Amino acid sequence: MTPQRIGFVASNAPVAQEALNVMAARYGQCPLPEADAIVALGGDGFMLQTLHETQSLDIPVYGMNRGTVGFLMNGYAEDGLRERLAEAEEEILNPLAMTAVTGAGEVFHRIAINEVSLLRAGPQAAWLKISVDGKVRMEELVCDGALVCTPAGSTAYNYSAHGPILPIGADVLALTAIAPFRPRRWRGALLPKTALVRFDVIDAQKRPVMADADGRSVRDVVSVEIRTEPAVRHRLLFDPGHGLEERLIREQFV
């Protein structure tokens, strides 16, 4: 079925705004809740923002790259958009759910499509205790931080921190240490997708830590729990032969 009603959104970048004007004039602009498909014009950061803002609509999102990297985006072209949408392959992503507790007792809930990261917020290294499914697995990780990522997010911050790239269909999460000092050679672990990961911050007042879920931060955390959220799904559209699985494989040979 060829989508007839398309809702366009764009980042603030001039090139994305120009594309928005061109595409909306050519294909029409439908209010997002009434659209058959949403077309996001921008880069990966804007795609993540769009997925977060439209997650309650259950409408597929097709990205067109008007940014830099564009890992989650398709190539930009003004012609044949409806045909591309009709032929696109859909990928379903389940995000991570983060529950962060601060030293003041505040509780924050966040959703992350790529990763949840903990980062030292002061000059001293973070000290983290790591538990998985209620069992302490590491009493003390001395590091700049740590993260938990989905397969879709494994090529982002995780890969830069020397974490593994995960196949898109793998039912696993990557737990990756960021600049670990002790244990010095410990890089991280692969965990079942169903795992509940908990970080407890040791000596949080002296060694403050912030938690970040896809760019949305919580400062002065004392504990963070992370799990997959199966009740939330994000629908991404990709051109045939250029889905996430192909992109993940290609990323490892560049």
UniProtKB/Swiss-Prot annotation:
Q: Give yes or no: UniProt keyword Ligase.
A: no
Query: Could you say which enzyme class this protein belongs to?
Result: transferase
Sample GO molecular function, one term:
metal ion binding
Q: Pfam families from the xrefs?
A: NAD_kinase (PF01513), NAD_kinase_C (PF20143)
Keywords assigned by UniProt, alphabetized: ATP-binding, Cytoplasm, Kinase, NAD, NADP, Nucleotide-binding, Transferase
Annotated localization: Cytoplasm
Q: Record-annotated residues binding NAD(+)? A: D44, G45, N114, E115, D144, A152, T155, A156, Y157, N158, Y159, S160, A179
Which residue positions are annotated as catalytic? D44 (proton acceptor)
* Protein's name according to its UniProt entry: NAD kinase
Q: What does this protein do?
A: Involved in the regulation of the intracellular balance of NAD and NADP, and is a key enzyme in the biosynthesis of NADP. Catalyzes specifically the phosphorylation on 2'-hydroxyl of the adenosine moiety of NAD to yield NADP.
UniProt-listed NCBIfam families: PRK04761.1 (NF003406)
Q: What InterPro entries does the annotation carry?
A: ATP-NAD_kinase_N, ATP-NAD_kinase_PpnK-typ_C, NAD/diacylglycerol_kinase_sf, NADK
GO CC, one annotated term:
cytoplasm
Q: Which family does it belong to?
A: Belongs to the NAD kinase family.
Q: What is its EC number?
A: 2.7.1.23
> Which cofactors does it use?
a divalent metal cation
Look up keyword Nucleotide-binding and say if it applies: yes
A GO BP term here is: NAD metabolic process
Q: Which organism is it from?
A: Cereibacter sphaeroides (strain ATCC 17023 / DSM 158 / JCM 6121 / CCUG 31486 / LMG 2827 / NBRC 12203 / NCIMB 8253 / ATH 2.4.1.)
* Enzymatic reactions: NAD(+) + ATP = ADP + NADP(+) + H(+)
The record's section on Gene3D superfamilies has: Probable inorganic polyphosphate/atp-NAD kinase, domain 1, Probable inorganic polyphosphate/atp-NAD kinase, domain 2
